[in-house]
Amino acid sequence: THLRQIYFAALDRETGEAGGEKILVDKLPLNLVQAGPIHRIFPDAKFVLSLRHPCDVCLSCFMQDFAITSAMANFFSVEDAATLYARAMDLWRHYASVLPLEYHEVRYEDLVSETEPVVRALLEFLGVDWHDAVMDHSSQARRPELINTPSYHQVAEPIYQRSRLRWPNYGDQLAGALEILASDIDRFGYSDGS
């Protein structure tokens, strides 16, 4: 389609590379609310739904120093972050129920505790061959031109568990968010405390 051609032309200009076999990963989490239009423009697109305890997601967003945009303005309070999370997940579930989206779920908690099997399953879904170097992601992450994220320093570190289930330390501050997120906590299998 015309929009697809425009997108790839802009990508070629931005990266300085043209054509060839590439795998493009757009990791902006809020793109899940664009799953419908993305599927329409790129019907063969594969989606990776990165899950994490909803309270940890909201706490992490609240604690980040994001550049202010209309979306990031929702992270000034954990309740607003929780509302955005719940609405975004509602829209994702709607798209997933009415469109033939090809997607794979990855739980952060599983990724940090059982990295290799989780990564192998993800690569299989993406149709990417396994290479042992995959387990040394931090060597690639040390190339800052490849990563543009507020958490660059974390991406360059080995996989760690210190952010897993951090939210209970802030239970009082997250009380309002817990109410908003209750159905997502249950729906994604986090109601058992994991």
How does the language model describe each region?
Residues 2-22, 61-105, 113-194:
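PAPS-dependent sulfotransferases, especially Golgi type II membrane carbohydrate sulfotransferases
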Residues 38-62:
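Conserved phosphate-donor/acceptor-positioning beta-strand/loop module used by diverse small-molecule
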Residues 33-36, 59, 116:
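Short N-terminal helix/helix-N-cap motif within the alpha/beta-hydrolase-1
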Residues 1-42, 50:
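Phosphate-binding active sites in nucleotide-utilizing proteins
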Residues 31, 55-56, 111-113:
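Short, catalytically relevant binding-site loops at active-site mouths
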